[in-house]
């Protein structure tokens, strides 16, 4: 019997972001719901056709989402927060939960969106389910069942996908005190029983139930919850229990006791688990081997995967299935659109559409199809050739990596000495004021950038236009009387892509979009070779800005770990090595900035915490190399050069040691929404260096009053000595307009001056 092939999910945004543009038109009122739904139906039909035409055994349905798949599950279960409830849940209900509802939109006091957070350690996000003790669950929104009917009527053999009950509970949060959301499990399971009964009535043979939390180090009560859950929802539909992003080593003994029919494991993220899983797989179970990486853009070495899976095929026979490691929603849609890539570079990649073909081809090869076996070998040649290419593995970069020593990551003087030097050179007042780096990216800037990229604006004219925006930003900051200025980053489209475009070793794409959440898509650059800086990147802009003012101008860099986390990494070397290469390139930029007279340099690291591995036992090793990469990038700074870093997290406690180990002279953090509560971690740790807790929530259009900012600064001063405090917004101001930016910053400067006078 032929090897069963399938994927865990397919990108829903469309190859040219058709879903994004339709959603935003609908939200603006430019199209009605019928037109929006037609776009969704057309995308689903195309996605299913891609899978069937490639020869997959199953076509996956239920993976389409109008915002994110967790929110889709929330509506399926009729579990809508009370502030958004009212009548039967529909598409507008879903958008209200995800985006919030203004006072004008509902004729009421408005209703806040539910929280959003990262989907495990990916750059995808989901709307967090809210739980209270009186919650009930009832199958409500029929989208899943309608999609199955659509797919069946189109002639596809359907395998629906459903987020599992235990993961759904785990990924949410309690919104009232004194109760544990796990106590809701029996009620939730009643709804899941009804869902599976409905699937059975639709003729579904297999359902993919995603329980990604099985890859975590679960507390006992959560691990134990699976037994009850899967005993109660047992039905006539066969269940493929699906895990991804890490190994199931910690939970495997419990998994194999569950009354399910198969297990999917991620052999891309955790290849080492294969032998253990095969050895413990219960008689009669299917093993779905996730060997085609759903989280990256690289072509699979299918000949190597074939060799790896053949012994498993011999043991399991038709009980071995071949699959993507996780949903392909984390990959761009179709490589064929990238007409501007060189043939060599293009031959290294596979986007979602190509990965579907990889899965199907590998399945045929495992069945002994000689043409497929030969095709796997031919297909894998570019990846094999790449391993020895000198323009990929550059000798000059390797020499620098081999010469990294412990001293390379250390500043030439301890913080206390540096602080004294900096106080003398910089001459800043108590409670110095600054911003985080970016200023409003106006429509004019975006039009000029687009015109330059399409050849309608010459390079010299574009540079003059950017200098005009920088001069304007400097003038506005001087008028506000900020103490440390920034150039505003008018030249940057994105804080990571800008550096990727200016460092050798990266490839950017035209259509390499992946969904972040809702209608927001990102286009990560791809690390294709050893990374090096061939020429200065930011020096010209920073020195031009400094020439316009006698105040200190802050140089602005994105840190090595953030660039790594927000790009598609290479698969042939470790993430640690990529971070070191980035660190060495940024180190050179730091040296050039200070040699050009820039005395303050900010190295942003908003993603250090995001890069944490899923298993806590792996945190220490990651944090050691992540911190070391930052320190390498900063350590070329002289004692009198002040190094800043910026982070925006909601939780510092578990990484405060590592934050301190960065040894930045100043750290700025996002604290305004937490009313300075986040500073507790720094207070309890006795954080030794300077700190700028954000006093202005830039994510809100509300203008903070002078009194409000003053109150926040006073709260901060209760936890951190005032001599070590800075005053700044939470984050960059790129997404705000100038009117609200200047109004907020005027209040920020006034509050700082008032307190400065009181403390004098």
UniProtKB/Swiss-Prot annotation:
Binding positions for Zn(2+) per the UniProt entry: 646, 648, 670, 731
Family: Belongs to the vitamin-B12 independent methionine synthase family.
Gene: metE
Cross-referenced SUPFAM superfamilies: UROD/MetE-like (SSF51726)
Catalytic activity: 5-methyltetrahydropteroyltri-L-glutamate + L-homocysteine = tetrahydropteroyltri-L-glutamate + L-methionine
Cofactor binding comment, as recorded: Binds 1 zinc ion per subunit.
EC number annotated for this UniProt entry: 2.1.1.14
Keywords, sorted A to Z: Amino-acid biosynthesis, Metal-binding, Methionine biosynthesis, Methyltransferase, Repeat, Transferase, Zinc
Role this protein plays: Catalyzes the transfer of a methyl group from 5-methyltetrahydrofolate to homocysteine resulting in methionine formation.
Pathway recorded for this protein: Amino-acid biosynthesis; L-methionine biosynthesis via de novo pathway; L-methionine from L-homocysteine (MetE route): step 1/1
Disulfide bridge partners, by residue number: none
Molecular function GO terms recorded: 5-methyltetrahydropteroyltriglutamate-homocysteine S-methyltransferase activity; zinc ion binding
Residue sites binding L-homocysteine per the record: 436-438, 489, 604
Entries under Pfam families matching the protein: Meth_synt_1, Meth_synt_2
Stated name of the protein: 5-methyltetrahydropteroyltriglutamate--homocysteine methyltransferase
Residues annotated for L-methionine binding in this entry: 436-438, 489, 604
Active site (catalytic residues): 699 (proton donor)
Cofactor (UniProt): Zn(2+)
Record: residues binding 5-methyltetrahydropteroyltri-L-glutamate: 17-20, 118, 520-521, 566, 610
Any GO BP annotation: methionine biosynthetic process
Origin superkingdom: Bacteria
């Amino acid at each position: 019997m032929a090897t069963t092939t399938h994927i865990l999910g397919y990108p829903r945004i469309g190859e040219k972001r058709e879903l994004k543009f339709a959603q935003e038109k609908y939200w603006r009122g430019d199209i009605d719901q019928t037109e929006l739904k037609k776009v969704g139906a057309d995308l689903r039909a195309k996605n299913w056709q891609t899978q069937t035409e490639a020869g997959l055994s199953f076509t996956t349905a239920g993976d389409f989402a109008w915002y994110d798949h967790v929110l889709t599950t929330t509506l399926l279960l009729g579990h809508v927060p009370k502030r958004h409830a009212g009548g039967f849940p529909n598409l507008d209900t879903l958008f209200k939960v995800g985006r919030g509802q203004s006072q004008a939109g509902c004729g009421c006091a408005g209703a806040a969106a539910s929280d959003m957070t990262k989907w495990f350690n990916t750059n995808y996000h989901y709307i967090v389910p809210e739980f209270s003790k009186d919650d009930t669950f009832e199958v409500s929104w029929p989208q899943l069942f309608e999609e199955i009917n659509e797919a069946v009527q189109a002639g596809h053999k359907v395998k629906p996908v459903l987020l599992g009950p235990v993961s759904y509970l785990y990924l949410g949060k309690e919104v009232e005190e004194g109760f544990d959301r796990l106590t809701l499990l029996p009620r939730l399971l009643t709804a899941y029983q009804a869902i599976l009964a409905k699937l059975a009535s639709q003729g579904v043979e297999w359902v993919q139930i995603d329980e990604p939390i099985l890859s975590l180090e679960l507390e006992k009560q959560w691990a134990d919850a699976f037994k009850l859950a899967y005993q109660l929802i047992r039905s006539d539909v066969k269940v493929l229990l699906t895990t991804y992003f890490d190994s199931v080593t910690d939970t495997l003994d419990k998994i194999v006791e569950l009354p399910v029919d198969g297990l999917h494991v991620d052999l891309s993220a955790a290849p080492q688990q294969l032998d253990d899983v095969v050895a413990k797989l219960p008689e009669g179970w299917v093993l779905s081997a996730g060997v085609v990486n759903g989280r990256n853009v690289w072509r699979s070495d299918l000949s190597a995967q074939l060799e790896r899976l053949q012994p498993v095929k011999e043991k399991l026979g038709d009980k071995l299935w071949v699959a993507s490691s996780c949903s392909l929603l984390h990959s761009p849609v179709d490589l064929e659109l990238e007409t501007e890539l060189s043939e060599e570079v293009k031959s290294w990649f596979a986007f979602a559409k190509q990965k579907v073909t990889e899965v199907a081809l590998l399945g045929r090869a495992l069945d002994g199809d000689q043409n497929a076996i030969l095709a796997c070998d031919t297909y894998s040649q570019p990846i094999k050739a790449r391993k020895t290419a000198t323009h990929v593995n550059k000798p000059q970069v390797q020499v620098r990596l081999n010469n990294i020593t412990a001293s390379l990551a250390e500043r030439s003087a301890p913080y206390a000495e540096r602080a004294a030097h900096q106080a003398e050179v910089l001459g800043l007042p108590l409670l110095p004021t600054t911003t985080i780096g970016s200023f409003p990216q106006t429509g004019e800037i975006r039009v000029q950038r687009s015109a330059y990229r399409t050849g309608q604006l010459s390079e010299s004219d574009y540079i003059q236009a950017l200098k005009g925006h920088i001069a304007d930003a400097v003038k506005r900051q001087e008028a506000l009387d900020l103490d440390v200025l920034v150039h505003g980053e008018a030249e940057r489209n994105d804080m990571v892509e800008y550096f990727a475009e200016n460092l050798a070793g990266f490839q950017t794409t035209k259509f390499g979009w992946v969904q972040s959440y809702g209608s927001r898509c990102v286009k990560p650059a791809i690390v294709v070779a050893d990374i090096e800086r061939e020429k200065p990147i930011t020096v010209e802009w920073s020195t031009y800005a400094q020439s316009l003012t006698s105040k200190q101008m802050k140089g602005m860099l994105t840190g090595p770990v953030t660039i790594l986390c927000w790009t598609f990494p290479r698969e042939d070397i470790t993430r640690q090595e990529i971070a070191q290469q980035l660190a060495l390139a940024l180190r050179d930029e730091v040296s050039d900035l200070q040699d050009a007279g820039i005395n303050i340099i900010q190295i942003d690291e908003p993603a250090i915490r995001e890069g944490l591995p899923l298993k806590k036992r792996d945190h220490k090793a990651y944090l050691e190399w992540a911190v070391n990469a930052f320190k390498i990038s900063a350590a070329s700074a002289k004692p009198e050069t002040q190094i800043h870093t910026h982070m925006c997290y909601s939780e510092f406690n578990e990484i405060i040691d590592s934050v301190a180990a960065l040894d930045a002279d100043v750290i700025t953090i996002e604290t305004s929404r937490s009313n300075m509560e986040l500073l507790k971690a720094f207070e309890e740790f006795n954080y030794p260096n300077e700190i700028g807790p954000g006093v202005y929530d830039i994510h809100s259009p509300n203008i903070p009053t002078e009194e409000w900012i003053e109150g926040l600064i006073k709260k901060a001063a209760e936890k951190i000595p005032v001599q070590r405090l800075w005053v700044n917004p939470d984050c960059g101001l790129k997404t705000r307009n100038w009117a609200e930016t200047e109004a907020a910053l005027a209040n920020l400067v006034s509050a700082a001056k008032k307190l400065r006078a009181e403390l004098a």
